[in-house]
Regions:
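Cytosolic regulatory regions of ion transport systems
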Residues: 1-183
């Protein structure tokens, strides 16, 4: 818009055209937010050759990430046309990588309008909103505080000589108990 105004062009009147990020996205992962967590997720997806598109509202981050070869687009993930352009309805998974509950719930609502079957994974600081998110249609909630605790205890047990298989089994058992100890 700024470039158009600088050239003396007038912004178009009426509704802006819907974004079109890519025409061949299917069975991909949509990453909502491309900060530290979103970038880490993308790095692992890329290493496994799993297609993804990331969406972020920071134009500098988007530009720099695109220059580095990342499939990142500018857009507010609470806007239906942005998620539609990212082909949420054809994706295998939507990841909400920011830990803001209200914003996450808005995104979940829009995703569910576009697809009632796509899996949704949400990052949260803790499990405070676990039931609300699950009831809204979230497939999995990842509470940072518990995951950090599980990682720490894994290292403690490993350094204390506990076999890796037993550590993995115990950690999985704790996750299966659905994070109830954090209240």
């Amino acid at each position: 818009l700024a470039k158009k105004l600088a050239r003396g062009e007038r912004p178009e009147q009426g509704k802006a055209a819907a974004p079109n990020f890519s025409t061949n996205l299917t069975n991909h992962v949509v990453i909502c937010g491309f900060g530290r967590v979103g970038q880490t997720v993308a790095r692992f997806l890329k290493a496994e050759a799993i297609p993804y598109i990331a969406l972020d509202i920071d134009p500098i981050r988007v530009r720099e990430s695109q220059a580095a070869g990342e499939n990142v687009q500018f857009g507010h993930v609470r806007q239906k046309d942005i998620l539609k352009a990212a082909k949420v309805d054809k994706s295998r998974l939507v990841i909400i990588s920011f830990a803001d509950y209200a914003k996450a719930m808005s995104v979940v609502s829009v995703v569910r309008q576009l697809s009632d079957s796509v899996k949704i994974l949400v990052r949260m600081r803790d499990d405070k909103y676990l039931m609300e998110l699950t009831n809204a249609g979230v497939t999995e909630v990842v509470p940072e505080s518990l995951e950090a605790s599980l990682m720490l205890v894994s290292h403690v047990l490993f350094m204390s000589g506990v076999p890796v298989k037993r550590i993995l089994r115990r950690v999985q058992q704790e996750r299966t108990n659905r994070y109830g100890i954090l209240h």
